[in-house]
Amino acid sequence: KISSTQTEIDEKLKNIYSNLDPWQTTMVARHEDRPKAKFFIDNLFDDFVPLSGDRYYGEDKSVLTGFAKFNGKSVLVIGQEKGEDLDSRIERNFGMMRPEGYRKTIRLMNLANKFNIPIISFIDTPGAYPGVGAEERGQAEAIAKSIECCMELKVPTIAIIIGEGGSG
């Protein structure tokens, strides 16, 4: 009985989610109960060692970065993090990265590339932070250099969209 009920639920969910219009799809991606990057980091990886700072200006808490073990193998983990409640969302800038976040990920991607460590990224952002301060600190250049770095990597990379996938 439980098995048939689960099958029925699965079929109904598949039917619902395969017929969403674009706005409904956006609302699902933005749903506050979706698991965030921290959830995946805590539940998929062992021995996560967080690394922070861009070595120029400061730390961007909208992106979690660090080395961890996945099935016993070393990986670099990058996760855009929106936060779970109002305070953590403000602290994490609602998942909108600043130049410091892009420079931090570039620094760590280059390190992973140097030591032949694969990269796993979790994407969940409405887009890059559009503030004046971010622009003054080189937001556009940081985004461009991040894209360039990704294109030049020699290590395997996996990018998993877990929510929004806005530009930046």
Q: What residues fall within each predicted segment?
A:
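Terminal-region recognition feature
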Residues: 1-168
